[in-house]
């Protein structure tokens, strides 16, 4: 997402370069400009996020080893830049969840292992999550929202 402040250029620049997160009503957005997963950058945009406890979870495109292991990748037999572009385009519409550690500000992937930890106190939710057999943002989001609703 791109967030702007209308005609106020100085506020737009502030939102783009200095703001860590923006909350509008009940929606939270995290600025990905300075965030990295391992050595990969997310880009200069805002991602929709959820705050559960002290942790912030946001959805973004799969990066690095997450992209390589994602069910979003496809076997492309074309080589060179053209083949790379086709393979990368398959990931554009895919999303996975990442977690920002509040103590270190490090970004980690929210995969099956992490979701098993988070859902540990809810065996029925955990079993349902494992039956879905997907690390996509659509599936992960459903269970993170259940945890968020329980927190209230």
Where do the language-model regions lie?
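Aromatic-patch recognition
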Residues: 1-123
């Amino acid at each position: 997402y791109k967030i702007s402040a209308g005609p106020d250029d100085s506020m737009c620049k502030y939102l783009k370069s200095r703001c860590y997160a923006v909350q509008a009503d009940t929606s939270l957005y995290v600025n990905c400009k300075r965030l990295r997963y391992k050595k990969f950058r997310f880009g200069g945009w805002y991602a929709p996020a959820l705050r559960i406890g002290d942790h912030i979870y946001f959805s973004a495109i799969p990066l690095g080893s997450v992209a390589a292991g994602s069910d979003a990748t496809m076997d492309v037999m074309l080589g060179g830049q053209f083949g790379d572009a086709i393979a990368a385009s398959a990931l554009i519409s895919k999303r996975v969840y990442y977690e920002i550690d509040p103590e270190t500000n490090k970004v980690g992937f929210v995969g099956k292992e992490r979701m098993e930890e988070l859902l540990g106190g809810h065996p029925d939710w955990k079993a349902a999550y494992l039956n879905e057999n997907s690390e996509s943002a659509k599936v992960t989001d459903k269970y993170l929202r259940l945890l968020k609703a329980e927190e209230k």
